[in-house]
Amino acid sequence: MNKILFYLTLALGFFFLSGCEQTTNKYLDITANSEDKIVIETQDVTTKAEFLNYKVDDVTIQLIVVRGTDGKVRIAFNTCQVCSPSPKAYFIQSGEYIICQNCGTKFHINKVGEEKGGCNPTPVEEQTTEGNRIILSKSYVESFKDKFADWQGQTN
């Protein structure tokens, strides 16, 4: 009986510890500047994704910014292209992957913002890069408001 309890405890401990992969996500609020630009500083972006909340009226539009394992900074809207407009069509990070909370599809962080179409985060197609800054126009970001109208992703 003691052997069974030992192995059961060991199995449960392994089960709970294996679920403790890196899942703490970082959420930040962003705003547009006086020139109607959203400026994202990238020098401190790491392989741990940052989820950036931009508020327009009563809707939160969320962006994912992450540095891939190849060193390239990537950005995308945090809504799944296929699962949207489901309220659960958003991603969280677990280790080097992001996972759709609606369908469970998993992507390596190197794919964030790289693929148009399919079950992955919506690419940010209108952006400019100046040194360590990604610059987006306020009007472009706000044009995605309808995609986030029923969105229920985490914001903090």
Q: How would you name each of these model-derived features?
A:
Residues S94-C103, E114-E125:
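Short cysteine/histidine-rich metal-coordination sites, predominantly Zn2+-binding motifs
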Residues F16-G19:
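C-terminal motif of bacterial Sec signal peptides marking the signal peptidase cleavage site
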Residues E21, Q81-S84, Q101, N120:
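Secreted/luminal cysteine- and crosslink-motif detector
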Residues T23-I92, E125-N156:
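N-terminal pre-ligand scaffold of iron-sulfur
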Residues M1-F6:
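Bacterial N-terminal signal peptides that target proteins for export
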